[in-house]
Design a protein with these regions (language model features):
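Residue-level detector of beta-strand structural context in well-folded domains
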Residues: 108, 128, 138-140
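Short Gly/Pro-enriched loop/turn and capping motifs at secondary-structure junctions
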Residues: 115-118, 138, 157-159
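Short, small/polar residue-rich loop motifs at catalytic or cofactor-binding pockets
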Residues: 134-136
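Short, well-ordered beta-strand elements
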Residues: 140-142, 147-156
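Short, surface-exposed loop or secondary-structure junction motifs
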Residues: 1-124
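Active-site beta-strand/loop architecture of penicillin-binding DD-peptidases
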Residues: 126-128, 146
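Short, structured beta-strand/loop micro-motifs enriched in basic residues and often containing a Trp
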Residues: 131
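Generic C-terminus detector
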Residues: 157-181
Length: 182
């Protein structure tokens, strides 16, 4: 896990799959990942920090454990709580930038679920979960109510939200609305 990867790490990067004419076409990692390997005046979203699946899962476990990982305190409990608390002004009603994700706000670095799924089309999940997804259809989430974390890494462009909906339905069940009492 590092910001701006050394060239020697390029062979370890997953290839990118691009949806073209209804088929997935594999793109070479060197062509798909150039912004991870050079200095940029401004790094666009989706580039810069790169990690392994294992490290990302450790990060998620640390968050679900309120800042502790393998017995070591990494972040204060209050920091994790602040990160996972909606920081948006309630006056901001337009949330079209989060299609299919339901009633969510935004914490520091995460979307935060504010109410149970209201429609069958919404992603399954629990109130208080926090998550983020990436341009290449990646997803991670932390569900404190169920003590659950998930890291779902595919490298598919353009973004495909149906993968997330189907993955969450497989984890929670298609009719899940949250733990009892939500």
């Amino acid at each position: 896990t590092a910001w701006r990867q050394p060239d020697a790490k390029l062979p370890r990067f997953a290839a990118m799959n691009v949806q073209t004419d209804g088929k997935l076409v594999q793109q070479d990692a060197a062509a798909a990942q150039p912004l991870h390997f050079r200095d940029n005046a401004l790094t666009p979203g989706g580039f810069g920090l790169a990690s392994t699946l294992d490290d990302y899962q450790r990060f998620a476990r640390m968050l679900v454990n309120k800042g502790t990982l393998d017995g070591a305190r990494i972040l204060k409990r209050s920091t994790v709580k602040l990160m996972a608390t909606d920081q948006l002004d309630p006056a901001i009603k337009e949330r079209a930038w989060l299609p299919g994700k339901g009633a969510v706000g935004f914490g520091f670095d995460f979307a935060v679920r504010k109410s149970p799924p209201q429609t069958h089309e919404e992603n399954r999940g629990a109130v208080g979960e926090f998550f983020w997804d990436g341009a290449a259809s990646t997803l991670f989430w932390v569900d404190p109510a169920n003590k659950l974390t998930a890291v779902f890494f595919v490298q598919t462009m353009p973004y495909d939200g149906t993968l997330h909906r189907d993955f969450r339905a497989a984890v929670y069940g298609p009719d899940y609305k949250g733990p009892p009492g939500d």
